[in-house]
């Protein structure tokens, strides 16, 4: 049974503490890359003592008759990357990764996360926590762990604004089978513990994203959405996902680091357009851009309006109330305000689908910004090699990241970074989403692997590039692993497939060469990329997530191609290009279908001294040479007055023999 209740004031209670535990299968049943649960890093990640926070949380749970409390990572809009004020899971657990769910019972606490963060979580969680390594055989999901903790008719609570309605229903149904129940706690318990130390909610001003970059007026996008509503016979669409609102209205914001979005909701009906946003965020220019047809309402009033819309829904031909359409990412709180499933149709958002197919203006912008970004990366790697090898300079990982940002910022249309730069040397490169911090990060070792995953936000597009270099002499294993990863990148880059194929179906192409050696990587092969929007964009992707099988790739999709390989405590390798799906000509057209392939837009050299050429086929060797010739042609013009970078680029793009 699903219902909403209000939380009670904070009380105090004693917490139980136990050593950090791992749910992990025997070594033989998963990739040896992560066989050792002990984390061997050359830096010390900070571990936060969460004992007192858990004491306070359990007091609140007791006061509200809760036996288990769930703390997801997401905010009220189900954002992957969140504002600091919404980092509740990080606050309660000490784990800073972008993905994971914390579950706290009266006697235990668990944190579930995916393979990108196994090492990081193991280092950051203190002894109060059990780490659930998601996706490994024999490891319970956070839902299963919650159900175990709630056995015997216990009550589980969650803030309904930070969990989707679909997830809440599914968990509730599972709990009810054992006599337990899920309830919504409207006032977030972690917020009460955080108190006045919780960061303020951002309220940054919104800017217009002009048609010269957007490629389509927002009025046309709304007209297209209304056609969808007519086809589906729905009363309106409730928009709660932030990048969908930014894209729909051709606006950009700055409320979440690295993601140009702003806190808002929207309701689109056949006759009206309501934008729920704090008025002070809108300049006169933005209000003029929106025009008189867009009614601006206070951000928080969406919930009261939802109830009114539900009660006054238009009628169908048979006299029954029409349903509203909303994304399957909409929060449980929003769903409850509308009256739940009876009043709402939850589905993959048509805005998400439309946003993922870039128009020609957006595609041109993505090509252009990647050329500028590629030039910035070449300048950085040339500088870094010179500093390490010729000048014998001592540079740490943050020094490198800061220098790269400085170089990027010189380029036209640069707005900021698209995510925290992953500047990692040696064993730190094996931490997939590693974040160096000044004072505790490592000095870059010229005799070890250096992995740099970085990206920029430009007015005309978003970039995301990973390159792995070795400025000394790589080992035989490092060269073999790098080359197998490169072969996987080429396999996806050169794939030709019938229209209607999903990224789920293509994932094995990038892994096949590693698989032949019994190797693999525990992250997806590719994710969608926004156009001056979120660097991680759905609904498309290449990987084993089941949702990737539910949507096929289409011309205009922009995704990453980023296979990798990681040896815990030794090194990590990843090569990442951004590729765009497009129609291609084939000698035959079986079934009269259209056939698709990819165009790569990333223009940065691939570390040649890590390539074991004997492992490449002639076609793969030619691909590398053609790619490097293209990089030289498109970026060398930036270095007419920069002899250092020009010479480095010439060296790194010379043909393989």
From Swiss-Prot:
Cofactor: record remark: Binds 2 manganese ions per subunit.
Cited InterPro entries: Creatin/AminoP/Spt16_N, Creatinase/aminopeptidase-like, Creatinase_N, Pept_M24, Pept_M24B, Peptidase_M24_C, X-Pro_aminopeptidase_P
Catalytic activity of the protein: Release of any N-terminal amino acid, including proline, that is linked to proline, even from a dipeptide or tripeptide
Leading EC class: hydrolase
Gene name for this UniProt entry: ampp
GO biological process: proteolysis
Organism of derivation: Talaromyces marneffei (strain ATCC 18224 / CBS 334.59 / QM 7333) (Penicillium marneffei)
Cofactor(s) this protein cannot do without: Mn(2+)
Protein known as: Probable Xaa-Pro aminopeptidase P
Gene Ontology MF terms in the entry: metal ion binding; metalloaminopeptidase activity
GO cellular component, one term: cytoplasm
